[in-house]
A protein has these predicted regions:
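Conserved N-terminal glycine-rich FAD pyrophosphate-binding loop of Rossmann-like flavoproteins
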Residues: 39-63, 199-215
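Short glycine/proline- and charge-enriched loop/turn segments
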Residues: 61-65, 143-144
Length: 431
């Protein structure tokens, strides 16, 4: 590609965000290429084990009539791949192509790649995700006597049968691993966490309970954020009381500006009394035991790390970007939701979906406005935001800066039409 003319746009990452941005770039008539280091598209969802599932309803994951047959990893991956086949994206995708370095030379983005030589583009979408590097905390003492596994690497949960398991973490992945440990008959389960995150206690399956629609309706009606918080807090308090989970309530009140509320796990909730819970960190793994910072010691066969992911932007030549390790940190370095303040013509769509929202639909809304900005029909400013925007609030923000894409429709009218007019059992329409 060294002899090719400068492109309008390069996209790094072939997960759901990258493919959606590729579709909207092609629809806008831009000269574009998508670079994916893996042998095939799918991003993190290609790497996850088959038992992993989404934290929201399937109708909130997909968009329009793109098919999704269920919430599990193979079904989610098939949905991601359907973007390629439905919209004929393959000609502009380069798989097995790692970006070794991305730098701006004052005029264009220059990408040094592993298989395509040097790619130049006026604009760059970094769609490598905000959670793309599994992370486990340091442990002062390890002697190898205890097996360790990150949630993303647990391929066969059946291997937990009869084992003494320690689950570490207080978020959604921890609840998943507790559920898997119970379903596959671990002999003993210890749960250690520094802090807990809010979840929705429920007996329903995640794929049913994880709907974004209740909050979306509040947003569509123009309910102020603090009143949204009050209503959701009251609902959660009633649910925690009903399930007898007051001991698991986080210390900090829920704030929809910062928190993602994910569904509880019915199996874990039903068997909570069987789980040995501790607030603390792992300080040592030796002699077949786990020592926690609360002073307790536990005989353990396997540690399951539900400690999440870090952001890896090490491919950027800009040291400030390369040093970023988290989505909140990256979001603070952006204006207008996802425009980089460190480099020109650089977009991080992943920060726009940190919280709650309808995944593909929100990415599509962002992608459409980015392409309008590149084409000159929208003006996405560089104004930093005081807080993250989610779902329909994100739509309102972009509609005011990209009226052409929204057909000149009043942003509030558009949000009411979509948020109140879309049946709960149907995906949002394709933007």
């Amino acid at each position: 590609m060294n002899t090719h003319p400068t492109l309008d746009l390069a996209i790094i990452g072939g997960g759901i965000a990258g493919l959606i941005h590729l579709h909207y770039a092609r629809r806008a008539g831009l000269r574009v290429v998508l670079l994916e280091r893996a042998p095939a598209v799918g991003g993190l969802w290609r790497e996850l084990p088959p038992w992993q599932d989404i934290q929201i309803c399937t109708v909130d994951w997909t968009v329009g009539d793109l098919p999704i047959d269920g919430p599990l990893q193979p079904q989610v991956l098939a949905n991601i791949e359907s973007w390629v086949s439905r919209f004929g994206l393959a000609p502009d995708i380069r798989t097995g192509c790692a970006v070794k370095q991305a730098r701006h030379d004052g005029q264009t983005w220059v990408l040094d790649t592993s298989t395509e030589g040097t790619v130049r583009a006026r604009h760059l979408v970094a769609a490598t995700g905000g959670h793309n590097k599994p992370w486990t905390p340091p442990v002062a003492t390890r002697d190898g006597s205890v097996a360790e596994c990150h949630s993303s690497a647990l391929r066969e949960p059946s291997e937990l049968a009869g084992r003494r398991v320690l689950v570490v973490g207080g978020g959604a992945s921890a609840l998943d691993l507790l559920d898997q440990s119970l379903l596959h008959h671990a002999a003993h389960i210890v749960w250690a966490y520094r802090s807990l995150r809010w979840f929705t206690p429920t007996n329903k399956r995640k794929a049913v309970a994880g709907s974004v629609r209740p909050v979306a309706r509040l947003q569509a009606q123009g309910v102020p954020l603090e009143r949204q918080n009050e209503q959701v807090r009251a609902d959660l308090a009633a649910r925690y009381h009903h399930f007898g989970l007051q001991a698991l309530q986080p210390e900090r009140p829920l704030d929809l500006a910062a928190d993602q509320v994910f569904p509880g796990r019915a199996t874990m909730l039903a068997a909570l009394a069987q789980i040995d819970r501790h607030r603390g960190e792992v300080v040592a793994l030796q002699n077949g035991q786990a020592a926690l910072s609360d002073g307790s010691t536990h005989a353990i066969d396997t540690v399951l790390w539900a400690t999440g992911y870090r952001t890896d932007l090490g491919y950027f030549a800009n040291p400030a970007l390369a040093a970023v390790t988290g989505v909140n940190e990256l979001s603070a370095r952006c204006g207008c939701i996802f425009r980089s303040l460190d480099e020109p013509d650089l977009y991080f769509p992943g920060v726009g979906l940190e919280g709650f929202g309808a995944t593909s639909w929100n990415f599509a809304i962002m992608a459409r406005s980015i392409m309008s900005h590149i084409a000159g029909t929208a003006h996405l400013d560089l104004e930093p935001l005081p807080r993250r925007l989610h779902h329909l609030d994100l739509v309102r923000h972009l509609a005011a800066r990209d009226p052409v894409s929204f057909g000149g429709q009043d942003p509030d009218d558009y949000c009411r039409e979509v948020g109140l007019g879309t049946p709960d059992d149907q995906p949002y329409p394709m933007p």
